[in-house]
Design a protein with these regions (language model features):
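A short, N-terminal "cap"/entry segment at the start of jelly-roll beta-barrel domains
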Residues: 1-52, 132
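Conserved short histidine dyad/triad with adjacent acidic residue
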Residues: 39, 56-70
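Short, conserved beta-strand element in jelly-roll/cupin
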Residues: 59-60, 70-86
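Histidine-centered metal-chelating micro-motifs
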Residues: 65-66, 85, 101, 105-110
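Structural motif
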Residues: 76, 83-85, 92, 108, ...
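A cytosolic small-molecule/anion-sensing beta-strand core signal
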Residues: 80-81, 96-97, 115
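Short acidic-glycine-tyrosine-enriched beta hairpin
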Residues: 90-105
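Ligand-binding loop in jelly-roll beta-barrel domains
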Residues: 105-129
């Protein structure tokens, strides 16, 4: 069982014995969290996570592409701002602020940003590949 300590990063060892983060801080202040590149014209900010869930803010410049890909995680995304052409399992829809989409595990999905904007992505389980070890 993981013991949660307010406002600290819990650490646990992975199979190799390396320390890895298992949860984020309790309070997530936007201007205190780093942004990292996630492709040309795309950057992401990891908002919060534990071993079961992760929330990530993703900003896109107009014309930026979230290349079609798959992952074993379930994903739900919310369009905070902008306009996006979203493809999932061969279906394409244009989504704007207030819209969202669900991606089942292993479904091929991607986006093209038609107007600069932000997506809020939620994954389960967490995307450990997004965490710096």
């Amino acid at each position: 069982m993981i013991k949660f300590v307010p406002d600290s990063d819990e650490r646990q060892s992975d199979k190799s014995g390396k320390a890895m983060k298992t949860r984020s801080k309790t309070f997530l202040i936007e201007n205190e969290l780093p942004w990292e590149p996630a492709g040309e014209g795309v950057r992401r900010q990891i908002m919060g996570y534990d071993g079961q869930v992760m929330m990530v803010k993703v900003r896109f410049e107009k014309g930026a592409v979230g290349t079609p890909h798959t992952h074993y995680h379930t994903q739900v995304s919310y369009v905070v701002s902008g306009l996006f052409e979203v493809s999932s399992n061969g279906e394409i829809r244009t989504l704007g602020p207030g819209d969202g989409f669900y991606v089942e595990p292993d479904a091929t999905h991607g986006v093209v940003c038609l107007e600069a904007g932000t997506l809020l992505d939620v994954f389960t389980p967490l995307r450990d590949d997004f965490l710096k070890k």
